[in-house]
């Protein structure tokens, strides 16, 4: 396998960047009135406009050459075929099987996984039906009104993001809660809002040993039993998303209510699996299935569209262009939709845990930057917070803008106001405002020359800040599924070009091991001297503080 810098297209892109790095998008648009038509794609009713990027036809040609030289198509086909592309863990990567609505056989070690996938989906459908109909009763005979999902990482971020995104589809009478942090405040404050008689807890841990999740799960169980009394009642109020039947049964959960998933499902790609049970309970199983349909639409597009017309490929290549040739360190995801308030946070994990790597698939350290820092907030809030830096700062921050044409929560002219900002921001970031233009706007002001010079520069915008725009009819379950899957495949494309394994997460392990050691040291008040002087000092000061006055 070749590293990014070993491909002929890389050298060509370095030379090309030297020639075009000072080109301004204002001039590119002025020279080509058809730029939007040429540099936009559609999938269903989703419009992807990438015309406001610092690219020429030659740039794109070289980027597509890079994708072909890096083997994006072959590796994509290997993933869909169930090959073990996660080399460090010797696993297949098959979140795509979870939304394989064509039910095509997908083999792992000669075994078709689709019957297992369909079995769990049917189990989820039946369970959701029982809860939503009121047939599932708590220990006192009352129906379930609150669902508390206890998980962390992919077992929390995805379900929470999707449930918030689809809040307008919420099942009447069901309130969803999510607990992830081992900080006791998260669990305590959640339990204060629910009743043991009508609450269902979902424990999401594949191994049923995840430290934070199981600490919270046992606290929830203790709280429940303190009020319910009978341990047999646990089975009416707790279900598990796990594969460890022995531990699940020991906890008191009926293994008939254990929903399985597989080692070829990575945590940050798991909302399509049984991990999505909390989504299905929140918005209805039919809407969960619509998410799967939307993701399948993106999968089929990714599998079949030529690279030049392939949305995730274009997304990934543009990110490579800015990351590896312009030196951009971050990417902002800016949804102009309050329901997507956790979308950027979800892809912080999705992207940064996937591509925050420095070792290639054949064990060499890379000599180039890999995963970008992902961040963002919904518009228009961000405009009054951090857009100042995006517009006038010295950092290049490529941005993705997302918006729905129609809202399910109409209020006066709010949607037009929201979308006017959506359109204006991408135009402003592209065009900017020259010093001369700013000076002309100040012509009617009574200003001294020095003040006029100062304000003309302060009110100028360099522009040439790249953006992608996603515009779609409405944020419904299918559209949400498509958007998520497009970003998943973008991550895949970039990981392939960087020649890294996007599907392990070794970087989270060291801290967990050290935390286990320190936790034992916190069992007493004796000073520690087993670490570096900074860590010793912090631990010892904590011990002093917790003793109180």
Curated annotation (Swiss-Prot):
Single biological process term from Gene Ontology: glycolytic process
Catalytic-site annotation from UniProt: 353, 384, 512
SUPFAM superfamilies the record matches: SIS domain (SSF53697)
Enzyme Commission number, as recorded: 5.3.1.9
GO terms, molecular function: carbohydrate derivative binding; glucose-6-phosphate isomerase activity; monosaccharide binding
GO CC, any one term: cytosol
Location (main, coarse): cytoplasm
Known catalytic reactions: alpha-D-glucose 6-phosphate = beta-D-fructose 6-phosphate
Broad class of enzyme this protein falls into: isomerase
Disulphide-bonded residues: none
NCBIfam families: PRK00179.1
Protein name: Glucose-6-phosphate isomerase
Organism: Solidesulfovibrio magneticus (strain ATCC 700980 / DSM 13731 / RS-1)
């Amino acid at each position: 396998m070749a590293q990014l810098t070993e491909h002929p297209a890389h050298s060509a892109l370095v030379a090309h960047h030297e020639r075009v790095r000072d080109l301004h998008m204002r001039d590119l648009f002025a020279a080509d009135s058809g730029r939007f038509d040429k540099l936009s794609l559609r999938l269903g009713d989703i419009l992807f406009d990438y015309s406001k990027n610092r690219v020429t036809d030659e740039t794109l040609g070289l980027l597509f050459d890079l994708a072909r030289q890096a083997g994006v198509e072959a590796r994509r086909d290997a993933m869909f075929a169930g090959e073990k592309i996660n080399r460090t863990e010797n696993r297949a990567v098959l979140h795509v099987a979870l939304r394989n609505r064509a039910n095509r056989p997908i083999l792992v070690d000669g075994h078709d996984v689709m019957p297992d996938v369909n079995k769990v989906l049917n189990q989820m459908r039946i369970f959701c039906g029982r809860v939503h109909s009121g047939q599932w009763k708590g220990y006192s005979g009352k129906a379930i009104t609150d669902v508390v999902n206890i998980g962390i990482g992919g077992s929390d971020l995805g379900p929470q993001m999707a449930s918030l995104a689809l809040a307008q589809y919420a099942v009447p009478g069901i309130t969803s809660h999510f607990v992830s942090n081992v900080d006791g405040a998260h669990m305590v404050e959640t339990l204060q809002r629910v009743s043991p008689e009508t609450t269902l807890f979902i424990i999401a841990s594949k191994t049923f040993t995840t430290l934070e999740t199981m600490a919270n799960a046992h606290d929830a169980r203790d709280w429940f039993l303190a009020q319910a009394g009978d341990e047999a009642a646990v089975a009416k109020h707790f279900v598990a998303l796990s594969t460890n039947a022995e531990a699940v049964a020991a906890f008191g959960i009926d293994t008939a209510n254990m929903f399985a998933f597989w080692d070829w499902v990575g945590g940050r790609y798991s909302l399509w699996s049984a991990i999505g049970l909390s989504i299905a309970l929140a918005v209805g199983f039919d809407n969960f299935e619509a998410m799967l349909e939307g993701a399948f639409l993106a999968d089929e597009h990714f599998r079949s569209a030529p690279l030049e017309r392939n949305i995730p490929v274009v997304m990934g290549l543009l990110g490579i262009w800015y990351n590896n040739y312009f030196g951009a360190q971050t990417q902002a995801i800016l949804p102009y939709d309050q329901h997507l308030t956790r979308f950027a946070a979800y892809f912080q994990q999705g992207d940064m845990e996937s591509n925050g790597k420095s070792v290639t698939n054949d064990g060499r350290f890379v000599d180039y930057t890999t995963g970008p820092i992902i961040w963002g907030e919904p518009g228009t809030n961000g405009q009054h917070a951090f857009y100042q830096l995006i517009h006038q700062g010295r950092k290049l921050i490529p941005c993705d803008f997302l918006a729905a044409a129609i809202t399910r929560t109409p209020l006066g002219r709010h949607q037009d106001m929201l979308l006017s900002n959506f359109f204006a921001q991408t135009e402003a970031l592209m065009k900017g405002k020259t010093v001369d233009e700013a000076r002309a706007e100040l012509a009617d002001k009574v200003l001294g020359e020095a003040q006029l010079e100062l304000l003309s520069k302060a009110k100028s915008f360099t522009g040439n800040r790249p953006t992608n725009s996603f515009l779609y009819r409405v944020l419904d379950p299918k559209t949400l599924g498509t958007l998520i899957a497009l970003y998943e495949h973008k991550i895949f494309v970039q990981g392939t070009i960087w020649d890294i394994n996007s599907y392990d997460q070794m970087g989270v392990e060291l801290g967990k091991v050290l935390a286990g050691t320190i936790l034992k040291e916190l069992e007493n008040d004796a000073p520690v001297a087993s670490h570096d002087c900074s860590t010793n000092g912090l631990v010892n000061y904590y011990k002093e503080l917790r003793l109180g006055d």
